[in-house]
Amino acid sequence: MNGKYYYGTGRRKSSVARVFLIKGTGQIIVNGRPVDEFFARETSRMVVRQPLVLTENAESFDIKVNVVGGGETGQSGAIRHGITRALIDFDAALKPALSQAGFVTRDAREVERKKPGLRKARRAKQFSKR
């Protein structure tokens, strides 16, 4: 990557995304593959593009993303968070609009741990009265 770039780290569930914005044509590369090839679900692709569409920068930047951990939903959310932070690095005036949409806030929800004596985090064994 030559020249000026803008960087943002995004996190969601157990996924971490490192996002680099470079002036360009709107190409999004995730782990060396185009975003449409990387994500099978259309909703995941939409989530990734949300901050760009909101700020009308969809065709202004080429985006290079490195994402590790988690599944499709977590990774797309982490990329969205990273793109949002990189856009704020590019222009701080975009922050109020991105905040209003809820993209700046890190979604702190994580998987609840399994407890001993239960089948899952909250699911108990079936109780039989007789």
Curated annotation (Swiss-Prot):
UniProt-listed Gene3D superfamilies: 3.30.230.10
A Pfam family reported for this protein in Swiss-Prot or TrEMBL: Ribosomal_S9
Keyword set includes Lyase: no
UniProt keyword terms in alphabetical order: Ribonucleoprotein, Ribosomal protein
This protein's record includes keyword Signal: no
Disulfide bonds: none
Residues of the signal peptide: none
SUPFAM superfamilies: Ribosomal protein S5 domain 2-like
GO terms (BP aspect): translation
GO CC terms in record: cytosolic small ribosomal subunit
A GO term for molecular function: structural constituent of ribosome
HAMAP family: Ribosomal_uS9_B
Similarity-based family: Belongs to the universal ribosomal protein uS9 family.
Protein name per UniProt: Small ribosomal subunit protein uS9
